[in-house]
Amino acid sequence: MSKALLEIQNLHVRVEEMEILHGVDLAVGQDETHVLMGPNGTGKSTLGYAITGNPTYSVTGGSIIFNGEDITELPVNERAKKGIFLSFQNPLEVPGVTLSAFIRSALEQKTGDRLRLWDFKKKLKETMALLNMDESYAERDLNVGFSGGEKKKSEILQMLM
């Protein structure tokens, strides 16, 4: 395995009074793909939420290392700025908010800078081309009427931007 991009060490996570994860260890290297599989209720989603910093999930032991930095105590917004992203099985549909507007707003929140529209649209177009995604999706309401595959492409686009 290459140097770990994400390393979970002896992670213990609880929700309210119930410990869900009991000493989980995991290492994911750069350019590796891992799949978590198991029956319902075995902690797959809990691990994802703990990695993203969802405050409902309390890390009571262990650590989460991302790009060599311990992010265990960072709030969710700081983890997101570092590139931590959780893809949902059924992403929310947001009528009235275009995919383009959503991504631009998220980028501005991440960077703290107001993005020039021309520069943003250029980067958006280039990134959509990488995904073989029709540019018209940028002006559609976020995930509204998207097929399952289009929703996944939308999430990947958000992550890449």
Report each predicted region and the residues it spans.
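Conserved structural motif at the start of ABC-family nucleotide-binding domains
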Residues: 6-8, 21-23, 28
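ABC nucleotide-binding domain signature
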Residues: 35, 80-89, 129
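ABC ATPase NBD Q-loop/coupling interface
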Residues: 63-79, 143
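Helix-to-loop junction immediately C-terminal to a conserved catalytic motif
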Residues: 52
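Short coil-to-beta microelement around the adenine-binding A-loop and adjacent beta1/P-loop entry
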Residues: 15-21, 78
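Short hydrophobic beta-strand immediately N-terminal to the Walker A/P-loop
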Residues: 34-36, 48
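The feature captures the beta-strand-to-loop junction immediately N-terminal to the Walker
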Residues: 37-42
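ABC-family P-loop ATPase nucleotide-binding domains
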Residues: 92-161
